[in-house]
Regions:
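Short, small-residue-biased leader/transition segments that mark boundaries at the very start
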Residues: 2-7
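Phosphate-binding active sites in nucleotide-utilizing proteins
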Residues: 8-26, 30-37
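Generic beta-strand/beta-sheet core signal
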Residues: 22-24, 57-60, 101-102, 130, ...
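A conserved beta-strand->alpha-helix junction
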Residues: 41-68, 158
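Active-site adenylate/phosphate-handling loop in enzymes that bind or generate adenylated species
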Residues: 63, 69-141, 145-146, 191-203
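A short alpha-helix-loop-beta-strand transition element characteristic
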Residues: 147-155
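The feature marks non-catalytic terminal segments
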Residues: 154-205
Length: 205
C-alpha cells in the first residue's frame, strides 16, 4: 500500500463508499514492518473513510509457484491476475459491488493499458481506478495533503516488487497469458484455497 492506494481510498470514501481492503503479504520476503506500514496507512485513511476491514493474504506460496512455472517476463501480470481473483473473492463474499485499484496509466510495466486490460479480464465485478490519470507529482501533492506521504515512502518490501523480471512484458497477449496460466494446473487452485482460508482480518478504526 502506497500513496496511490491512500489517495484511491480517500477519493472513493468522500463519495460515501465503505471500504474493505486487501493486502498481499509474502513472508519472509516481506517483513512484519511492511505489514505494519499497511496497517498504519489504513488507520490514516480511516480518518476519512470510517472503519476499514483489512484482509491480509499470505501470497508467498502462490508467488513462488508462479515464479517456478511461468515465463519470468510474465510474472507481474500473472501474479496481479491472481491478486485480482482473490480480491474479487472477498468482494463477493462481503457483497461489495466493485473493486478499486490504485493504478495510474503507464507508471510501471503492469500499468499500461494492455496490462490493465489483462488484469481486468479475470474479474466479473467492475474495476474502478480513481487515480488513473494522475501523474507522480499530483499523487505526491495529494498524499501530502491527506497526511499519508511520509508513511507511504517508508522503504519496506512490497510483494509486487520482490519477483520482478528485468524486462517485464508491457503489452501482454491475452492468449499467451492464458496459456501460461494453464501450466499452473490444479496446484494453483489448492494454493489459492489455502491463502483464502488463512487470511487474517484486521478491523481498522
Amino acid at each position: 500500500m502506497g500513496s496511490e492506494m491512500c489517495i484511491r481510498d480517500s477519493m472513493i470514501a468522500k463519495r460515501g463508499v465503505k471500504i474493505d481492503a486487501v493486502y498481499f503479504h509474502a513472508p519472509p520476503y516481506t517483513s512484519e514492518r511492511a505489514k505494519q506500514k499497511v496497517v498504519d496507512l489504513a488507520r490514516l485513511v480511516a480518518k476519512y473513510s470510517g472503519p476499514i476491514r483489512l484482509h491480509v493474504v499470505n501470497f508467498t506460496d502462490i508467488q513462488l509457484y508462479i515464479y517456478d512455472q511461468c515465463p519470468h517476463d510474465e510474472l507481474t501480470i500473472i501474479m496481479r491476475r491472481y491478486m485480482m481473483r482473490i480480491a474479487e473473492h472477498f468482494a463477493k463474499k462481503d457483497r461489495c459491488l466493485g473493486l478499486i485499484t490504485g493504478e495510474s496509466i503507464g507508471q510501471v510495466a503492469s500499468q499500461t493499458l494492455q496490462s490493465l486490460a489483462s488484469t481486468n479480464e479475470v474479474c466479473t465485478l467492475p474495476v474502478y481506478r480513481p487515480v488513473i490519470g494522475f501523474d507522480k507529482e499530483e499523487i505526491v501533492r495529494i498524499s501530502r495533503k491527506i497526511d499519508t506521504f511520509e508513511t507511504s515512502i517508508q522503504p519496506f518490501e512490497d510483494c509486487c516488487t520482490i519477483f520482478v523480471a528485468k524486462h517485464p512484458v508491457t503489452k501482454p497477449n491475452l492468449k499467451v497469458i492464458r496459456r501460461s496460466e494453464q501450466k499452473l494446473s490444479e496446484k494453483i487452485d489448492e494454493l489459492m484455497e489455502t491463502a483464502l482460508n488463512t487470511t487474517e482480518i484486521i478491523e481498522i478504526q
